[in-house]
Amino acid sequence: MGRTFRLLSALLLGLLLINACAPKSEARRAGYAKEFYEKGLSEYRKGDYGDAKSNFEKALNYLEHLTPEQIKKVKYLLVKSAYKDKDYVDAVVYAEDFLANYPGSKEAEEVFYILVDSLVKVAPDPYRDQTYTVEAIRKAKEFLAKYPDSRFTRKVEEVIEEANKKLAYHEYYIAKFYEEYGYPYNAAIRYREVLINFPEYFSEERLAYKYIKNLLLTPKQVKREREKLEDFIEEAKEKLEEVKSPEEKKAIENRIKFLEGEVKRWEKIKEEAFKEAERALQRYREVYGENAYYKELLKLMKKWKS
């Protein structure tokens, strides 16, 4: 009985201590919320956007002690602080968060613009992956549809132009890479994409020349691919003679069938490349005349036919 009483007394004392400390703890958290919020505002007004961003982030750790209007203001100024500090990755993150929570607010239009501009600035140079560039274009078009009379319209149109130029050079560099490393068919496909989608950024005359030239060099790639596939087929046939189980035999036979299909596919690619090169060369002559590029392409065509 005495032991039970002591245990209950200890538990009761613990609860009293917790309850006594709770108001102090909450008061401390409320103090932190106020401190970081006010520091953030002060730093933002002074133009110290990195410090402002840091303080606003800390203030959100105690958001239960901020009013709804203060939370909205913190989230809005977080977007602007990150953007003005050229921390475009965080600007994208905070802009998306703000738009998700306050899509109809008066600040949403500006935040949406910041999101678009930050996406294109996050996007790397044309040599690397352009996922962010594609997303920037998508968001920019969404912005123009949503805010047709926006004060940011001109800037968003400039973002689209900048993003399209990045995509154009990205495609061009891929084509050039394939061309330089001996994959003319792949290069031709990429040059065609540039011709169709981004002709305004390059000399169409030279692009058309490169497209046709790589079509005419396709037999070199086809020969290399065919030889490689034939080696694989020979290896598979040798292995087929060694295996015993029906399952293994079936698997190897299927592999041989697939490889033989690939040989036929490459031969068809060569045929189609020749036909397209003939058509494209005729169009080239009609548009650009019998210039130096045309004469070089004509020699390649005659070499293929011989």
From Swiss-Prot:
Keyword Transferase: no
CDD domains found in the cross-reference section: BamD (cd15830)
InterPro entries to which the protein is assigned, alphabetical: BamD (IPR017689), BamD-like (IPR039565), TPR-like_helical_dom_sf (IPR011990)
Any one GO cellular component localisation term in the record: cell outer membrane
Principal location listed in the UniProt entry: membrane
Subcellular location(s) per record: Cell outer membrane
Signal peptide range: 1-22
Purpose of the protein: Part of the outer membrane protein assembly complex, which is involved in assembly and insertion of beta-barrel proteins into the outer membrane.
Assembly and interaction partners: Part of the Bam complex.
Family: Belongs to the BamD family.
Name assigned to this protein: Putative outer membrane protein assembly factor BamD
Organism: Aquifex aeolicus (strain VF5)
